[in-house]
Amino acid sequence: MARSFGANSTVVLAIIFFGCLFAFSTAKEEATKLGSVIGIDLGTTYSCVGVYKNGHVEIIANDQGNRITPSWVGFTDSERLIGEAAKNQAAVNPERTVFDVKRLIGRKFEDKEVQKDRKLVPYQIVNKDGKPYIQVKIKDGETKVFSPEEISAMILTKMKETAEAYLGKKIKDAVVTVPAYFNDAQRQATKDAGVIAGLNVARIINEPTAAAIAYGLDKKGGEKNILVFDLGGGTFDVSVLTIDNGVFEVLSTNGDTHLGGEDFDHRIMEYFIKLIKKKHQKDISKDNKALGKLRRECERAKRALSSQHQVRVEIESLFDGVDLSEPLTRARFEELNNDLFRKTMGPVKKAMDDAGLQKSQIDEIVLVGGSTRIPKVQQLLKDFFEGKEPNKGVNPDEAVAYGAAVQGGILSGEGGDETKDILLLDVAPLTLGIETVGGVMTKLIPRNTVIPTKKSQVFTTYQDQQTTVSIQVFEGERSLTKDCRLLGKFDLTGVPPAPRGTPQIEVTFEVDANGILNVKAEDKASGKSEKITITNEKGRLSQEEIDRMVKEAEEFAEEDKKVKEKIDARNALETYVYNMKNQVSDKDKLADKLEGDEKEKIEAATKEALEWLDENQNSEKEEYDEKLKEVEAVCNPIITAVYQRSGGAPGAGGESSTEEEDESHDEL
C-alpha cells in the first residue's frame, strides 16, 4: 500500500552535521591557504594547545610553565586576567571571576541546566534575548554583559598567544575541539568564539575522536575496536571507534554535556556546607568569598583522593570566625558521588548497543579527561567490561589537544609520513527520515551513520493533478514529524498533472565532508528538479532536546507504533476507496463493464466512505479496518462478477489491473 505526501506534506530528512571530520577532505587544497594550524582543546575547566612540528606534536606550556591553562577569566578594577592569574584571585574576587562558561555556550537561558548553574556560580548569569549572558563589573566599576562566546574567545586568545610565543610568529588558524555530543548551536557558538578571538577555525573536531588519534597514531597492524571514555571537568562523552592502519571510523557516540568533575566538586561542597551548619550553626551558602575558598579546597581534595585514601580539608578564617579543618576519605567522596559515577555507565551501554559490539570485542578502553583518574570511575568501567583494565597510555589532560594538533598538521600540509594515511570518519548522531501521509516520519538513515552519505528514494503524489510537491527536511528519532525537528523546506513545482500515484519523484539526500546537506527532488518524467542546501543552522537542538528525543522515543515507542498503525489503516481505507472511485469512472477500466445498479452501489459506498473519513479524522485503527471491510463487502463481489463476465481475473482488493509496476512508491 503506497503512502503519500499530503498537499503540505514533505520529504523530510534528518541529518546531523556534528563533527564531519575528514582529514582527507581537501587537505592539500586547504594547505595552500593555511599557515601553521594549532590544535586547541577548549575545556570546561582547563584548556590545552598543541602544534604539529618537525614530525611530532608539541604540547605548548603557558607563561607559567604549565601545559594546561585554567579556563577562567577575572576582572579587577585595573585589568582582565586569564588562566592561572584569574583562578588564583577568585577567592577574593568571586563575583568578577568567570569559569565553567562551556556549560553555557550555545544554550538557551531557560535551559534547566543553565538555571541549575546560576545557583552554583558566584557571578551573575542574566537573560539577554533568550540567551545566558554573564554580567560583571569591569575596570572603573563599569558593569558589562558578556556572551559565553566572548568569554570563550578570551580563553582561546590566551591559547593562541601561548602558541605564538612558542612558535615566534602570528597564528591565524586553529582546529578546536568540542564534546562529541555537542549540538549544532553549541558548535556554531564555539566557532563564533574563535572568530572573536581572531582565529579561523579550520575544523571543529570531536574530543573523543581527537583522543583516539592520540592513542592510535603510532598503532600499526590490524583492526582494533576502541572505546574512548572522556570524562572531563564539565562534559562526558563515549565514542566507539574502529582503528585500522590510520583509518579512524566512529561507530557510535553518546554522552552528557553536563556531567563532569565540577559536579563532583559541588557534591563535596554541599557536604561541607551541611557539616559547617551542623557543627557551627553557620550558613555559608550565600557567601561567595567563603564558597570560592571552599570550591578551591574541594577540587584540591578531590584530586588528592585519586592517589590517597584520606585528605584533610583545611581553610583558615573560612567564614565569620570559623576555621575549617575536617578529614575527607575516599570512601566518603565515592559515596557522595556514587549516583553520578554510575550515571556514566548508561552512555557506555548505549554506545556499545549502537555500535553493535559485545563487551569482549572491545580491544582497548582509552581514558581521557582529568576525572578518569578517579579510582571508582576506573573500577566501574573495569567491572562493566568484566575485568578488562582501561588503557592509561595517553595523557588524559593532553590527548585531545594532541589529536587536534595532528589534524591541524594535516590541514596545514605540515604533517609527514606519520599522518599521511590518517582518515577520520565521524557520524551523524540523529536519524534522517522522510514524511509520508499522516505526518509519518519514514526513517531512511539511522543515527550513528558514517558521513558523508547519499541516499535516494522514489516517491509519488497524493492528490490527482498535483503539480507541486513540498519537500521538507527533518531530524529526529520519533515516528511522527511533529515530534522531530524541521531543518528546511522547498517546493518542486511544474510536476505534469496526472492521477495520484502516477508521477515518480526521486528525492536525494547528500551530506558532504564539511557537514553541508544537499537535498534534491527530481520529477523523473519531465526531468524538472529543485534542490536546497542546508548549512549548519543556528538555534539547533539543545542537548536537553536531543536527550528528550531519544528518551521519548524509547518511552513512547509503543505509543508511536499505535499512532503509525492508525495512520496506515486510514491510508489503506482511503487508497482503496479512491482506487474504486477511479475504476468506476474510467472507461479503460470498469466504467463500461458495470451494469447500472452495480455502478450506483459502488459510487454510493465510496461516497459514504469518503464522507465518513471527513467526519472521522482521528478514529482508532480498528474503526478504519472495520470501515474498509464494509466497503470491500460491497465492492469486491461486484468486481469479481465483472471480471467473470469478461473472462478475466479479478484485481486484488480492487487494485487497478493495468498497473504495470508491482513496486509501490511512498506518496508525497
Curated annotation (Swiss-Prot):
Disruption phenotype: Bip1 and bip2 double mutation affects the fusion of polar nuclei during female gametophyte development. Bip1 and bip2 double mutation affects pollen tube growth and length. Bip1, bip2 and bip3 triple mutation is pollen lethal. Bip1, bip2 and bip3 triple mutation affects female gametophyte development during the early stages. Residues 1-23 form the signal peptide. GO terms for biological process: response to endoplasmic reticulum stress. It is found in: Endoplasmic reticulum lumen; Nucleus. Induction: Induced by heat shock and sugar. Up-regulated by light, DTT and tunicamycin treatment. It comes from the Eukaryota. Belongs to the heat shock protein 70 (TC 1.A.33) family. DnaK subfamily. Interacts with BAG7. The keyword Transcription regulation applies. A motif (Prevents secretion from ER) lies at residues 665-668. The gene is BIP2. SUPFAM superfamilies: Actin-like ATPase domain, Heat shock protein 70kD (HSP70), C-terminal subdomain, Heat shock protein 70kD (HSP70), peptide-binding domain. Expressed in mature pollen grains, and pollen tubes. GO terms for cellular component: endoplasmic reticulum; endoplasmic reticulum lumen; mediator complex; nucleolus; nucleus; plant-type cell wall; plant-type vacuole; plasmodesma. Residues 643-668 are annotated as: Disordered. It comes from Arabidopsis thaliana (Mouse-ear cress). Residues 657-668 have a biased composition (Acidic residues). The keyword NAD does not apply. In cooperation with other chaperones, Hsp70s are key components that facilitate folding of de novo synthesized proteins, assist translocation of precursor proteins into organelles, and are responsible for degradation of damaged protein under stress conditions. Involved in polar nuclei fusion during female gametophyte development and is essential for the regulation of endosperm nuclei proliferation. Involved in sperm nuclear fusion with central cell polar nuclei at fertilization, which is critical for normal endosperm nuclear proliferation. GO terms for molecular function: ATP binding; ATP-dependent protein folding chaperone. Keywords: ATP-binding, Chaperone, Endoplasmic reticulum, Nucleotide-binding, Nucleus, Signal, Transcription, Transcription regulation. This is Heat shock 70 kDa protein BIP2.
